Amino acid sequence: MTSHRLPEITLTPELTAAAAEAKAWPFEEARKILKRYAKTGLPETVIFETGYGPSGLPHIGTFGEVARTSMVRHAFRILTQDKVKTRLICFSDDLDGMRKVPDNVPDRAALEPYLQMPLSSVPNPFGGDYKSFAKHNNAMLCRFLDTFGFDYEFASATEYYRSGRFDTVLLKAVERYDDIMKVMLPTLGEERQATYSPFLPISPKSGRVLYVPMKKVDAKAGTITFDDEDGEETTLSVTGGKVKLQWKPDFGMRWAALGVDFEMFGKDHQTNAGIYDRICEILGGRAPEHFVYELFLDQLGQKISKSKGNGISIDEWLAYAPTESLALYNFQKPKTAKKLYFDVIPKTVDEYFTYLSAYARQEWKDRLNNPVWHIHYGNPPKADLPVTFALMLNLVSASNAESPAVLWGFISRHVPGVTPENNPELDALVGYAIRYFNDFVKPTKKFRAPDDVERAALEALDAKLGELPAGTDGNVIQNAILDVARAIERYQDHTKKSPEGGPGVSVSFFQMLYEVLIGQERGPRFGSFVALYGIDETRALIKKALAGELA
């Protein structure tokens, strides 16, 4: 088990009062637990649980469960004024059989002989000190949870089954075998009904997890009898890790054995939630409170799968953005299916810093609805980001900067007094921006030559910028750009009005600027970009475009 220190809580009357009214989803979920114990009073310890299937490396969805559950746990601590102990158990189903060889492992053929073996008995294909596939993947999960400083207890199904921690409930499952079958059989097709058993023996001969019908279930002896793979009739005790449960009964058994009060799971489990609950109750437990979240999708709109390795990995996100941005993406709209791919990173980074800058100015009731309060467990840091991530990406694109020093040259001129030393958050973003640009923006950059109308517009813009002194504010530059566009019929938008009452400016004008000057379809406010990049530098860029040196 791995355990870390819980974040400290400073309770104030303002915080307590705001929490009682807070509408953010972690508070709504925490109130379910209060309601659960409204009649009996709260227990000494409330148990939160998340599950992990180590058939593949942990992905962001796996991390998201722990992050979101931790947010609910923190909200619960505030609502109870931290008078009730809490535990978060991260449970790995590492006794499950390997149903197929994952796509994203080295030397797949070497794992073929281990199909249907418990994941904790499959050799580790990645090298290093971990003895099994599951031990490696469990370590990868813990490593990442540790980098975030989560307070959690890691639990292994293999250890819990083999150490006897589930024995009492497993013996109860033998006693109540018929009741469990009454829940399970109606959920199965006719063919499966004939052979289904909630018990999966682990063959004493081959070590494989067996999906075989039961010949006898002996409640008194606590044993099951079945035919092993070679046809020999075999009797095993259900205790000591010789037998495990099918995954649906296993879910409910775990809740009963551990006394779980709250567990969230993906929408793919929603139809089975009633089954898990019923099994838990049959085995003498009380079903926990649930929270069902929508699944993350890859760039093609497909469900992200650990074994396929599609979508984006934890390490990949963290190569291009700070960890807090990942926590924000998990906090936002958990009941909405969202695409989880590289192109969501810049927007999420900028949203995080926008929320962070707003926090200090907010009343308590608004603070508790601000994602950064939940991400940082009520103690968000102070950070001032004078340049957005999106703007920095455009700066890298226009300047072809390969080193942080070049970018800092532009930033220091634009925001005097800001240095890498006194703004480490911004310095980190500079590194992220260069890496993100090189890996995702640069390969897709595509400049196009301007047509005659666009050439005239660019010439007019060049002349207009020439009238502005160096160091002109971004808003003034933006207005000057709009003045140029308003005079050109193609870019007049008659559904909008200019300050003078004439037509407004179509977004197609700014799209043209980005396509011709930056080689991208869109970008942040162009006036802000010019202020950061420099008026003279932007004019030089326009001249290059007009001379055909970009496209």
Swiss-Prot record:
Please state where this protein is localized: Cytoplasm
The EC number(s) attached to this protein equal 6.1.1.6
Q: Give me the residues that bind ATP, please.
A: K306
| Species in which this protein is naturally found | Brucella suis biovar 1 (strain 1330)
Instruction: Kindly state which reaction or reactions the protein catalyses.
Output: tRNA(Lys) + L-lysine + ATP = L-lysyl-tRNA(Lys) + AMP + diphosphate
Q: Where is this motif: 'KMSKS' region?
A: 303-307
Record protein name field:
Lysine--tRNA ligase
The record's Gene Ontology cellular component field reads: cytoplasm
Family according to the record: Belongs to the class-I aminoacyl-tRNA synthetase family.
Please indicate the residue ranges that the annotation assigns to the motif 'HIGH' region.
54-62
Q: Does the keyword Ligase apply?
A: yes
Q: What class of enzyme is it?
A: ligase
The protein's matches in SUPFAM superfamilies, at most eight in alphabetical order, are given as: An anticodon-binding domain of class I aminoacyl-tRNA synthetases, Nucleotidylyl transferase
- The protein's superkingdom reads Bacteria
Gene Ontology biological-process annotations = lysyl-tRNA aminoacylation
UniProt main location, coarse:
cytoplasm
Q: Which Pfam families match?
A: tRNA-synt_1f
Arranged from A to Z, the UniProt key words for this protein are: Aminoacyl-tRNA synthetase, ATP-binding, Cytoplasm, Ligase, Nucleotide-binding, Protein biosynthesis
Q: Name one GO molecular function term.
A: ATP binding
